[in-house]
Amino acid sequence: MLFRICWLIVILVTTLVAELLCCRVGALFAAPFFLCFYLVVTCNWQIGLAGGIIACVVSEVVLSRSFTALPLLALLVPFAHMWRHNGDRRHAYIQALPGALFGLSYATWFVVGENIVLWPLGFRMAVGESVWIVVLSTVCAAIGFPLMIAILDGIASLAKLPVFCQRSVG
């Protein structure tokens, strides 16, 4: 049990570091969504939701965001549960599809939200800048999610824990 808790802490820190690194280049990396999706498919929906909530809250506190993405996270869990039973987990190009979808939704959520919070005209982002952030975030997510799965699977396989790519259907 203690070993699994340590594993969860390691993958939580890994995902948050990935998000911070992508933020340095101007992309909103959907690391809490990726962690939630990974844990729901690999373990179960309770662990996935708890890990996603912790990652989301820590990410928002560290990055000083104005509001939360927890409502979107709640929508992600049924999708991940469906993917657990029906989705293909072994190919990176298939893994890039939910990655791009999560990146697009995460970036759009925060860009629109920040523009609403910064309502006075002088403080909002320009449309071109907003679109650039969403596009860059989607591309980073489509590339980053399969990479993150490979890294987290490597950590899990060293620890003899269940891995995403070898999880049997059902």
Segments and roles (model prediction):
Residues 1-170:
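Terminal, non-globular segments
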